[in-house]
Amino acid sequence: MTKHYKIIGLRILSWVITITGLIIFIGNVHEYGLHFTYNQVLAIIIVILLLVTTMYFSVTPKLLKWNEKYELVWWLCYLCAPIYLFLTNLYNSTDLGYTIKFWLFFGGGAALIIISKYILKNKK
């Protein structure tokens, strides 16, 4: 398998992890009621923007070339990583299950993208 297909596979895997986490998170909200705090709303907005931006920059040909030159998506991931770690602690630090689900939802895709970028960069 070529390097190009491996990168596409990692991106698809990161989208699947993030979308699965989002479905689990929405299921929990539906089960326990719609009581959002400011941090939860902020986290949902950030992760949806990150997911949409990553997909958009990965699919559009002109933006894909521009993204490879300037690496905007990777910088977005680097900037969002400390935010989701901070918001995880604010989300519900007393319940380990919620913390794990929130990490999966908010950080799964972005973390996988960062790790894959690091691995691919160090292989050269």
Curated annotation (Swiss-Prot):
Keywords: Plasmid
Source species, domain of life: Bacteria
InterPro entries for the chain: DUF5504
Protein name in the entry: Uncharacterized 14.5 kDa protein in laf 3'region
Lineage: Bacteria, Bacillati, Bacillota, Bacilli, Lactobacillales
